[in-house]
């Protein structure tokens, strides 16, 4: 929590106002933020200075790992995070690549599981990484990236957290996740949960020990209509101790994640928090 609150305070104190063309709002912005999560010791980075929810974030992550491209599939998993971007984004609604209601296009998981090749074939980046790590292989290129500029126009949103690099040191697995843009009051809690859970799950299904997750953010910002709530309500609150994330030990393979895993397979223990804060969301 200290590093999260430190980033929030840094934005409030030192951020620069930038006009965001997509949303039409100003953002108080800083460049470069590095966060670290101790996954090996299960220090789950769930925000305690406001009520936070982890299952929706993990549901979204599972949807990415399965290669989903439809908001309805994410809703079935337990998250509505793609409803707005797939159905309320005017640019996407008028995009000829949009296939209909709830369609997200070629974003996130589609790129991770089905990256299009020039010859008409596809690359399953995630399976390659899982197979390598399961066999104790780290070729210094154990990377899953969702960032495909050649297909940006074919999706409703460019990826924010776009690349995940896995590193194997002995039998301990580490993760470095890269994020180009972060709505800190709303999105960062989701992103922290996902980075932590991704390393925990990948270590579990490849038979490795989980180590550290390194979360690198380029553009970290607070929207103008979020600033007062962050500065005057959330930042003055004292954080509670970190909770722990419990994952069903029966999850042993990528196929398990693709088929039967639900949010009932995840539980948080020891979570204490302050009251909820309703931050505005910008589509």
From Swiss-Prot:
Query: What CDD domains does the record point to?
Result: TS_Pyrimidine_HMase
This entry's Enzyme Commission designation comes to 2.1.1.45
Catalytic activity, reaction form? dUMP + (6R)-5,10-methylene-5,6,7,8-tetrahydrofolate = 7,8-dihydrofolate + dTMP
Top-rank lineage group of the source organism = Bacteria
Signal peptide start and end residues: none
| One matching Pfam family | Thymidylat_synt
What GO MF terms are annotated? thymidylate synthase activity
Q: Which Gene3D superfamilies match?
A: Thymidylate synthase/dCMP hydroxymethylase domain
Q: Where does dUMP bind?
A: 22, 180-183, 191, 221-223
Family label: Belongs to the thymidylate synthase family. Bacterial-type ThyA subfamily.
What GO cellular component entries does it have? cytosol
Annotated positions binding (6R)-5,10-methylene-5,6,7,8-tetrahydrofolate: 183, 282
Its pathway?
A: Pyrimidine metabolism; dTTP biosynthesis
The UniProt keywords, alphabetically, are: Cytoplasm, Methyltransferase, Nucleotide biosynthesis, Transferase
Q: What does this protein do?
A: Catalyzes the reductive methylation of 2'-deoxyuridine-5'-monophosphate (dUMP) to 2'-deoxythymidine-5'-monophosphate (dTMP) while utilizing 5,10-methylenetetrahydrofolate (mTHF) as the methyl donor and reductant in the reaction, yielding dihydrofolate (DHF) as a by-product. This enzymatic reaction provides an intracellular de novo source of dTMP, an essential precursor for DNA biosynthesis.
What name does UniProt use for this protein?
Thymidylate synthase
Kindly state the subunit structure of this protein.
Homodimer.
Q: Where in the cell is it found?
A: Cytoplasm
Q: Where is the active site?
A: 160
GO BP annotations listed: dTMP biosynthetic process; dTTP biosynthetic process; methylation
Q: What is the lineage of its organism?
A: Bacteria, Pseudomonadati, Pseudomonadota, Gammaproteobacteria, Alteromonadales
Q: Which PANTHER family match?
A: THYMIDYLATE SYNTHASE, THYMIDYLATE SYNTHASE 1
Instruction: Tell me which InterPro entries the record gives.
Output: Thymidate_synth/dCMP_Mease, Thymidate_synth/dCMP_Mease_dom, Thymidate_synth/dCMP_Mease_sf, Thymidylate_synthase, Thymidylate_synthase_AS
